[in-house]
Amino acid sequence: MICSIMGGLRSLRAARPYSHQSNTETKHMGLVGVASLLVLVADCTIFASGLSSSTRSRESQTLSASTSGNPFQANVEMKTFMERFNLTHHHQSGIYVDLGQDKEVDGTLYREPAGLCPIWGKHIELQQPDRPPYRNNFLEDVPTEKEYKQSGNPLPGGFNLNFVTPSGQRISPFPMELLEKNSNIKASTDLGRCAEFAFKTVAMDKNNKATKYRYPFVYDSKKRLCHILYVSMQLMEGKKYCSVKGEPPDLTWYCFKPRKSVTENHHLIYGSAYVGENPDAFISKCPNQALRGYRFGVWKKGRCLDYTELTDTVIERVESKAQCWVKTFENDGVASDQPHTYPLTSQASWNDWWPLHQSDQPHSGGVGRNYGFYYVDTTGEGKCALSDQVPDCLVSDSAAVSYTAAGSLSEETPNFIIPSNPSVTPPTPETALQCTADKFPDSFGACDVQACKRQKTSCVGGQIQSTSVDCTADEQNECGSNTALIAGLAVGGVLLLALLGGGCYFAKRLDRNKGVQAAHHEHEFQSDRGARKKRPSDLMQEAEPSFWDEAEENIEQDGETHVMVEGDY
């Protein structure tokens, strides 16, 4: 479909490192993709979003299942608040690796990032050599042909698109000060403006016709810069296919992988261009911040079971809340669209940039072990409970912090996120849970006759408090004889850990996938993913062969690669 561009068009060319070069030389000095004519065009209002029902999961995990009597679902305000944590419904794509959609370019299907929520703190860690000209920064420009010839293998540079306008203004990174002033950008937040800018940028095919393929973005909230990434790949591992710090030698690609860090890059936010399709939606639809003072839980048997009570939960020891946040993103069960197998030709030439669709490549739809919380156990040790169960209720714990794989480490709303209406204060985890006793009376769940407990949910100090209390006298007659040994665990409005008593919970927990007893997962936090068992999909995909000019024959060398932008940027 050809996009009808409205407004002034600007012809752009690939970035040049030297302004004095001749026209002939600059044709070879631009982005190596010059020959491919895969370029960008500003999207116009009639341009379809390209969200394909065949490639994007539309089926969300239902929050209302087994929620009879759940006060977090009965109250409209609370139900709306809890639904934002349903990443299957609101994000609809991979998180660790997001390649959730397929788009056709020149008769071939390619995969693109497609998630609808920003991924806070996500960055790509490069394993280039620790020597010039390598900088191990994925936000560096993609390499020019000249830069590659000077460095040799592995490739230098990073993933950033390096096109410029005739006036010399770079397309990426683009200053937020300019996006704020631009009438084409309607978003109300800095992050939304960057996402919208990415959504208005699409690839062109070899005939200079607009496609529907869009590129991911990274917003740097510290520098207020919007990066458009020309490389959609997010993970490449294995010494047969890529090198780590130059070993093994002579491989075209260096290895790289998505990361979140305990101490660094919290100001970077990775997202697909589709966050910008409705650039203000993420403010209320996505779990952008961590939730302080509560454990995620699932409503069953008339009470809220936090993740430590679910049989398929993974529990690991951590030294800090930040490590639990990292684990929520990097654990082996998190939603990922990474393909299952490596192509045999991945090192045949230096041309792997766009992910190529293959039949064995998964579309996770956002389903995965995307949820977790930090808590302190009865011995005083910090623990991280990880689950694939979408939370539909909360258990009070003043020492706990609940995380999602998409959200930030921050327990407050970042100051650069502003509401659509400036007169309205942006919601925080605290204000979102406010209640009044007259409108939120005490409610009780059904009696769990095994534990002889029922859940009491009430409004205390303007906050929802969920605690476990004894069943009524009549209900206690139906409880087992050992009730006294496992009851009475609610202290000061905080539900303690050992609701099932002792260590029997972990002794009985089974690994859902293998059907055998599961380990307690009490090992120390490991920052090196290579020391752990990789998920089956931790493999690369074949990518666009036409990025490098040598991959195509009979490439037209007349004229430059063009970028068309609606209006002035």
UniProtKB/Swiss-Prot annotation:
Glycosylation sites: 86
Post-translation changes: Proteolytically cleaved during invasion within its transmembrane domain, releasing a soluble form from the tachyzoite surface. The cytosolic tail generated by ROM4 cleavage during invasion may trigger parasite replication within the parasitophorous vacuole.
Region (Disordered): 518-548
Topology in the lipid bilayer: Single-pass type I membrane protein
Main localization, broad class: membrane
Extracellular side: 49-483
Phenotype on disruption: Severely compromises the parasite in its ability to invade host cells. Inhibits secretion of the rhoptries, organelles whose discharge is coupled to active host cell penetration.
DI: annotated segments: 67-287
Cellular localization per UniProt: Cell membrane; Secreted
Mutagenesis / variant outcome for changing residue 489 to G: Enhances cleavage 13-fold
Gene3D superfamilies in the cross-refs: 2.10.70.70, Hepatocyte Growth Factor
A family per Pfam: AMA-1
One GO term describing the cellular component: plasma membrane
InterPro entries the record matches: Apmem_Ag1
Coiled coil: none
Transmembrane helix in keyword set: yes
Role: Essential microneme protein that plays an important role in host cell invasion. Part of the moving junction (MJ) complex, a ringlike structure formed between the plasma membranes of the apical tip of the parasite and the target host cell. During invasion, the MJ migrates from the anterior to the posterior of the parasite, leading to internalization of the parasite into a parasitophorous vacuole (PV).
Subunit and interaction comment: Component of the moving junction (MJ) complex, composed of AMA1, a transmembrane protein on the parasite surface, and a complex of the rhoptry neck proteins RON2, RON4, RON5 and RON8 localized to the cytoplasmic face of the host plasma membrane. Interacts (via ectodomain) with RON2 (via C-terminus); RON2 serves as the receptor for AMA1 on the host plasma membrane. AMA1 and the RON proteins are initially in distinct compartments within the parasite, namely the micronemes and the rhoptries, and interaction happens only upon initiation of invasion when the micronemes and rhoptries discharge.
Protein name: Apical membrane antigen 1
Species annotation: Toxoplasma gondii (strain ATCC 50861 / VEG)
